[in-house]
From Swiss-Prot:
Keywords: Acetylation, Cell cycle, Cytoplasm, Isomerase, Nucleus, Phosphoprotein, Rotamase. It is an enzyme of class 5 (isomerase). One of its GO terms (molecular function) is peptidyl-prolyl cis-trans isomerase activity. It comes from Homo sapiens (Human). It is found in: Nucleus; Nucleus speckle; Cytoplasm. This is Peptidyl-prolyl cis-trans isomerase NIMA-interacting 1. InterPro entries: PPIase_dom_sf (IPR046357), PPIase_Pin1 (IPR051370), PPIase_PpiC (IPR000297), PPIase_PpiC_CS (IPR023058), WW_dom (IPR001202), WW_dom_sf (IPR036020). The modification Phosphoserine is found at residues 43, 71, 108. Changing residue 23 to A: Reduced affinity for KIF20B. Interacts with STIL. Interacts with KIF20B. Interacts with NEK6. Interacts (via WW domain) with PRKX. Interacts with BTK. Interacts (via PpiC domain) with DAPK1. Interacts with the phosphorylated form of RAF1. Interacts (via WW domain) with ATCAY; upon NGF stimulation. Interacts with PML (isoform PML-4). Interacts with BCL6. Interacts with FBXW7, disrupting FBXW7 dimerization and promoting FBXW7 autoubiquitination and degradation. Directly interacts with RBBP8/CtIP; this interaction depends upon RBBP8 phosphorylation. Residues 52-163 form the PpiC domain.
Length: 163
């Protein structure tokens, strides 16, 4: 039976308190979805662990006063708290999920990373090139999937896997 099959790495089954329905939560990316995530561990272009050797992602970064470098192309000195940064990130996620805004336009307007000029596009990368929490979230996402808040030394990210 398909429901008894093992979930892909990072995924767990949960019960929604509001609707009483089962949903799936990825503790690596903080993504949640109603549909059961599909595991694909035996197709071409993968490394030995059943994941692609490289992924391509875009992101929206919100820095805060505790970020490794609390400045950006948008603001010389960032003074917002980590909690305020998380509120901004959660607001952007809601706007994207509701269809009010698209990821790329929000990234180009509000990301504290210079990749904002490329609508958040970071290009393709392999393991070992990004900070570990960012890398783990990126590789756990499926193409077209968006993460929840991802915390790194740089700040708080929303990641969209594009390839």
């Amino acid at each position: 039976m398909a429901d008894e099959e093992k979930l892909p790495p990072g995924w767990e089954k949960r019960m929604s308190r509001s609707s009483g329905r089962v949903y799936y939560f990825n503790h690596i990316t903080n993504a949640s979805q109603w549909e059961r995530p599909s595991g694909n561990s035996s197709s071409g272009g993968k490394n030995g662990q059943g994941e692609p050797a490289r992924v391509r992602c875009s992101h929206l970064l919100v820095k805060h006063s505790q970020s490794r470098r609390p400045s950006s192309w948008r603001q010389e000195k960032i003074t917002r708290t980590k909690e305020e940064a998380l509120e901004l990130i959660n607001g952007y996620i809601q706007k994207i999920k509701s269809g009010e805004e698209d990821f790329e336009s929000l990234a180009s307007q509000f990301s504290d990373c210079s990749s904002a000029k490329a609508r958040g596009d970071l290009g393709a990368f392999s393991r070992g090139q990004m900070q570990k929490p960012f890398e783990d979230a990126s590789f756990a996402l499926r193409t077209g999937e968006m993460s929840g808040p991802v915390f790194t030394d740089s700040g708080i990210h929303i990641i969209l896997r594009t390839e």
